Amino acid sequence: MKTKKFSNKNKINEMITAKKVKLVDQNSVMIGVVDIEEALSRAKAVNLDLVEIVHDDQYPLCKIFDYSKYRYSHKKKISDSKKKQKTIIVKELKFKLNIGDNDYNVKLNMLRGFIERGDKVKISLRFIGREILHPEVGMEIIERLIRDTADIAKPENLPKKEGNIINMVLTAK
């Protein structure tokens, strides 16, 4: 069975190798430069840990506090910040040049739902066969989409033609 190992970035208690340290007590009062034995005995006297905060060449800065409590609260902060992050998903809707009114309305409702959830929506309008000879009809469909979603969405970039496809990305206002 594997056990999860926590990587300590700070040296604690007997792991500190310096002979003398700058000591800050549990009330954040600077004690000054003391021997490591005295610092360890002060920490043990109040049932707390001696933690090396800043490693300095001459005297490392050490503080007396409950390291396990600090580690727990630090993990909790990290997990809370991960929960609050929202990943933006890019959804894609594909249109054709000869789309019917009902099909257009269904896709428009899907687009509205994606935008209201906070997703970006990539619109792809594909030309098939000789339809490529009439790109202005495709641009009319794209402009109609922009007009119909103007209340909740805005184009992230202008519609651009890449080969036989016109692409555009819509985002929430």
From Swiss-Prot:
Protein biosynthesis listed as a keyword: yes
Matches recorded under SUPFAM superfamilies: Translation initiation factor IF3, C-terminal domain, Translation initiation factor IF3, N-terminal domain
InterPro entries given in the database record: T_IF-3_C_sf, T_IF-3_N_sf, Translation_initiation_fac_3, Translation_initiation_fac_3_C, Translation_initiation_fac_3_N
Gene Ontology CC entries for this record: cytosol; membrane
Entry's Gene Ontology molecular function annotations: ribosome binding; translation initiation factor activity
Compartments where found: Cytoplasm
Keywords, comma-separated and alphabetical: Cytoplasm, Initiation factor, Protein biosynthesis
Keyword Transferase: no
GO biological process: ribosome disassembly
Database matches in Gene3D superfamilies: Translation initiation factor 3 (IF-3), C-terminal domain, Translation initiation factor 3 (IF-3), N-terminal domain
Chain's role: IF-3 binds to the 30S ribosomal subunit and shifts the equilibrium between 70S ribosomes and their 50S and 30S subunits in favor of the free subunits, thus enhancing the availability of 30S subunits on which protein synthesis initiation begins.
PANTHER family: TRANSLATION INITIATION FACTOR IF-3, TRANSLATION INITIATION FACTOR IF-3, MITOCHONDRIAL
Quaternary data: Monomer.
Protein family: Belongs to the IF-3 family.
Protein name, UniProt field: Translation initiation factor IF-3
Native organism: Ehrlichia chaffeensis (strain ATCC CRL-10679 / Arkansas)
